[in-house]
């Protein structure tokens, strides 16, 4: 597990998520026993999910089914230790602004040097900012 300043990366992500004002709770959903134990070890809350999910979206759907009373779930990837807590709040606020919204994803303008980076996910949107498709290439 990657360490940053002596702490696991997932702990930094967890702490950033806890700094956001809107979430009532922060839970790490994982299919990895080591991640689960690490989160519990630093006092965080974690749940184990199925290892058979083909994507993170499927994992998130499992979490949503297990927490039917929760209105909004914000998905933060475990490799985002520098995520500004304000981003989490902005995403959560989108659901307050549009009551019929079912899913939202944050996007940012891409730096020119990332255009040809296959690890950088690109999104194509319509004129209203709604995603048409995502691409990692």
Task: Label every PLM stretch briefly.
Residues 23, 69-70, 98-101:
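Short, high-confidence coil segments that cap the C-terminus of an alpha-helix
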Residues 21, 39, 135:
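Short, flexible helix/strand-to-coil boundary loops that buttress conserved ligand/catalytic motifs
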Residues 83-137:
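Conserved core of the sugar-phosphate nucleotidyltransferase
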Residues 1-29:
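N-terminal glycine-rich phosphate-binding loop and ensuing alpha1 helix
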Residues 6, 51, 78, 125, ...:
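Active-site donor-binding loop signature of nucleotide-sugar glycosyltransferases
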Residues 6, 32, 128:
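ATP/adenylate-binding site constellation spanning eukaryotic-like Ser/Thr protein kinases
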Residues 27, 33-76, 80-93:
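Short phosphate-binding loop-to-helix
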